[in-house]
Design a protein with these regions (language model features):
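N-terminal low-structure segments adjacent to metalloprotease catalytic domains
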Residues: 1-33
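Auxiliary, metal-adjacent structural segments of Zn-dependent hydrolase domains
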Residues: 31-96
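Long, low-complexity, Ser/Thr/Pro- and Asp/Glu-rich intrinsically disordered
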Residues: 71-81, 98-100, 122, 151, ...
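Active-site scaffold of zinc-dependent metalloenzymes
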Residues: 75-115, 127-131
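Active-site recognition of the HExxH zinc-binding catalytic motif
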Residues: 114-134, 149-150, 154
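Pan-zinc metallopeptidase signature
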Residues: 182-193
Length: 193
C-alpha cells in the first residue's frame, strides 16, 4: 500500500543520508592525520605506515603489486604514468582495496616521501566519488575525472595541492583549477550530474 511505500522511501533516504554522513566523517578523519612535509621526516616504512593509516581510516587496504591489473584489464601501465590505482568493479569485490605499483619508475623516491600519502588520498577520492555517484567517472566531471579527483583529494582529504601540482607537472588531465574544485565540491554535496 501507499503508506508502506512512503515508509520504505523515508527509510532509504535516511540510510543514504547516514551513509553519506559516515563517508564524510571518515574523510575528515583521514584529512586530520598529520603528514610531515619533507622526505627525510620518515623512513620508507614510516611513510608506508602513514599511508596505510590514512587508507584504513576509510576501511581501505593497500595492496602492493608489480603490474597494473584491474578486473582482467591487465597489461602495460598506460604511458608508465600510473603509480597507484583504484578498481571500480561491478561486484564491489575491489571496493575496499587500492593498489600501488612498486614497479613504477619513481617508486623508490615515492616510497620515501609525503607524495605517497597524497597518491593514496587521490585513490581514496576515486572511491568516495564512486560511493557517492555509483561510478568513478560521474557525468558532472565530464572529461576532467582525474582533475576533479585531485581537487576532491585536496578539499576533502587534505592532500597537498602544491605537491600534487609539482609531481604531475605537464599532465593536463590531472591539472586542478577553480572549476575542478567546484565540481569536486558539487560531487561531495551529492550532485553527480
Amino acid at each position: 500500500d501507499l503508506r508502506s511505500l512512503h515508509k520504505l522511501r523515508s527509510d532509504v533516504k535516511q540510510q543514504v543520508s547516514t551513509a553519506v554522513s559516515n563517508l564524510h566523517n571518515a574523510e575528515a578523519a583521514a584529512a586530520a592525520i598529520a603528514v610531515p612535509e619533507r622526505n627525510g621526516d620518515l623512513d620508507p616504512a614510516g611513510w608506508y605506515t602513514l599511508a596505510t593509516n590514512v587508507a584504513s581510516t576509510m576501511g581501505v587496504q593497500i595492496e602492493q603489486t608489480m603490474e597494473f591489473n584491474c578486473g582482467g584489464q591487465s597489461g602495460e601501465n598506460p604511458n608508465g604514468f600510473v603509480a597507484a590505482y583504484y578498481c571500480q568493479m561491478p561486484d564491489r569485490s575491489q571496493r575496499d582495496i587500492m593498489h600501488i605499483l612498486t614497479t613504477h619508475p619513481d617508486w623508490t623516491q615515492t616510497a620515501r616521501s609525503p607524495w605517497l600519502v597524497d597518491m593514496v588520498k587521490h585513490e581514496l577520492s576515486h572511491r568516495s566519488i564512486m560511493i557517492s555517484c555509483g561510478t568513478t567517472q560521474p557525468k558532472i566531471a565530464s572529461d576532467r575525472t582525474e582533475a576533479v579527483t585531485n581537487s576532491y583529494s585536496v578539499l576533502f582529504f587534505g592532500a597537498d595541492r602544491d605537491r600534487i601540482t609539482n609531481q604531475q607537472q605537464g599532465v593536463a588531465e590531472y591539472a586542478m583549477d577553480a572549476h575542478s574544485d567546484q565540481l569536486a565540491t558539487a560531487i561531495h554535496d551529492g550532485n553527480c550530474g
